[in-house]
């Protein structure tokens, strides 16, 4: 790579620096250009020479001073930077150091000395170091800090002078009483609180205010509704009282002509009976032309009498009742909405009564359902117990039948048992429970009889026992068949 870099610019420079018509001077210029290129190549080689070294894999607890002690004696260098461990790179928490040497020979000696050198930490763990060229060969420049022009000029600053003046006045105020100071502090706090207004706080305050206004409106409406209801009830009651009074007055007025009528009632009754009898006779008879005209005249006269009576009653009522003034009539006209409010109140009462009736019906229906469920449960339990009893009866019958069958089987085995009993009587051994047959009947005093009686009598007794068993089995069968 170095040879290519050396040859390429030479060829270019030669072609460019050969002007036409200048032969002798061209040789001198070519020699100067070759010298300049050699200097540039040397500078490039110096720049390309690696001088910055990094020491990696150092213990995480190692400090800069401890590392410098280990590296003594240090060769000539112009840059030394130490970086402690980084906890974010766990578990690879190692320290490292960068050194820029002035001489290339010192780099080789340093590498031979510290590459693979084992460092120990506080806990005695070993950390073999690695020495190699740094990937970034440039060194950080040390910035020369310029002196600030404002250093030592605070006494001349006008703001500082104002501060000193205000500070002196504050000291004078401190001599005042604590009450005045508290008042001043409270006033300042109030001003600060009043000034602290953000859009969020204003929004929340407005929201709270709107809620309070809505609540007040609701309360006011409820109060008005209650007042209106009370007024409607009061008016309705007053109207009812007034109507009752009017009805009572009318009844009193009607009673006066009724008393007068009571005196003439017997005559009227006689006339009525006579009229009924005459009417019946007339109905039986065929009406003639003259009679029909007379009947029409009588009916017309009756109608006129009835109309006259109704007019007299109306006139009597109007005379008896006091005349109302125009103001009262005007007051009565706007009473229509009051009547409507009374009707609404009555309708509400009717709806409430209907709701109560519906609730009572639902409760009765639920009670009936519960009673039906309880009855069904009782029926189910009764049926269950009845079925259980039937099953028990069937089981008892089956057991009785099984006993009868087993008795028959014992009769067939009886002959074989006779021979065994004879041998047992001869031996006169005690019979144990395990040696007894499964279906042998209990015979009290059988052992004493066997000892006293000869073997022939024992056989007879065995035959009689077998006959008894047969008879008992037959009787059981008969009972089972009858059942």
From Swiss-Prot:
Keyword Nucleus belongs to the record: yes
Residues covered by region (Necessary for interaction with RBM8A and for activating NMD): 430-447
Residues modified as Phosphoserine: 310
Outcome of swapping residue 52 to E: Abolishes interaction with UPF2
Compositional bias annotation for Basic and acidic residues: 1-14, 34-50, 209-268, 285-314, 323-409, 417-437, 457-483
GO MF entry, a single one: RNA binding
Residue ranges that the Swiss-Prot or TrEMBL entry lists as coiled coil: none
Disulphide bridges, residue numbers: none
Region (Necessary for interaction with UPF2): 30-255
Subunit record text: Found in a post-splicing messenger ribonucleoprotein (mRNP) complex. Core component of the mRNA splicing-dependent exon junction complex (EJC); the core complex contains CASC3, EIF4A3, MAGOH or MAGOHB, and RBM8A. The EJC core components EIF4A3 and the MAGOH-RBM8A dimer form a composite binding site for UPF3B which overlaps with the EJC binding site for WIBG. Interacts with EST1A, UPF2 and RBM8A. Interacts with CPSF6. Interacts with DHX34; the interaction is RNA-independent.
Protein name: Regulator of nonsense transcripts 3B
Gene field: UPF3B
């Amino acid at each position: 790579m170095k040879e290519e870099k050396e040859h390429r610019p030479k060829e270019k420079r030669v072609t460019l620096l050969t002007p036409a018509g200048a032969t002798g001077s061209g040789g001198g210029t070519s020699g100067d250009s070759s010298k300049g290129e050699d200097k540039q190549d040397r500078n490039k080689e110096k720049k390309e020479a690696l001088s910055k070294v990094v020491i990696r894999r150092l213990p995480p607890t190692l400090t800069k001073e401890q590392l410098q002690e280990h590296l003594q004696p240090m060769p000539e260098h112009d840059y030394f930077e130490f970086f402690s461990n980084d906890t974010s790179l766990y578990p690879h928490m190692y320290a490292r150091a960068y050194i820029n040497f002035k001489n290339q020979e010192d780099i080789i000696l340093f590498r031979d000395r510290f590459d693979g050198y084992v460092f120990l930490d506080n806990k005695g763990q070993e950390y073999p170091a690695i020495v190699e060229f740094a990937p970034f060969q440039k060194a950080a420049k040390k910035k020369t800090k310029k002196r600030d022009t404002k250093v030592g000029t605070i006494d001349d600053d006008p703001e500082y002078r104002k501060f000193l003046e205000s500070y002196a006045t504050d000291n004078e105020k401190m001599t005042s009483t604590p009450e005045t100071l508290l008042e001043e502090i409270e006033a300042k706090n109030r001003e600060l609180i009043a000034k602290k207004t953000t859009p969020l706080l204003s929004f929340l305050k407005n929201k709270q205010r709107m809620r309070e206004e809505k609540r007040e409106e609701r309360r006011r409406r409820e109060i008005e509704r209650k007042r209106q209801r009370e007024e409607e009830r009061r008016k309705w009651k007053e109207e009812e009282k007034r109507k009752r009074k009017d009805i009572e007055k009318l009844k009193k007025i009607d009673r006066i002509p009724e008393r007068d009528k009571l005196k003439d009632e017997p005559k009227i009754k006689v006339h009525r009976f006579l009229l009924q009898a005459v009417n019946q006779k007339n109905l039986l008879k065929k009406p003639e032309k003259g009679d029909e005209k007379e009947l029409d005249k009588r009916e017309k006269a009756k109608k006129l009498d009835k109309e006259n009576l109704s007019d007299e009653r109306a006139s009597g009522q109007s005379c008896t009742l006091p005349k109302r003034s125009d103001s009262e009539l005007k007051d009565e006209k706007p009473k229509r909405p009051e009547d409507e409010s009374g009707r609404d109140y009555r309708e509400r009462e009717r709806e409430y009564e209907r709701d109560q009736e519906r609730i009572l019906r639902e409760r009765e229906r639920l009670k009936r359902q519960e009673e039906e469920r309880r009855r069904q449960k009782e029926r189910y339990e009764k049926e269950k117990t009845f079925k259980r009893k039937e099953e028990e009866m069937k089981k008892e019958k089956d057991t009785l039948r099984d006993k009868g069958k087993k008795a028959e089987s014992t009769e067939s085995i009886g002959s074989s048992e006779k021979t065994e009993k004879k041998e047992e009587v001869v031996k006169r051994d005690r019979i144990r429970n395990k040696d007894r047959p499964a279906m042998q009947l209990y015979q009290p005093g059988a052992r004493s009889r066997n000892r006293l009686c000869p073997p022939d009598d024992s056989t007879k007794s065995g035959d009689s026992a077998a006959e008894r068993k047969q008879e008992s089995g037959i009787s059981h069968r008969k009972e089972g068949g009858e059942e």
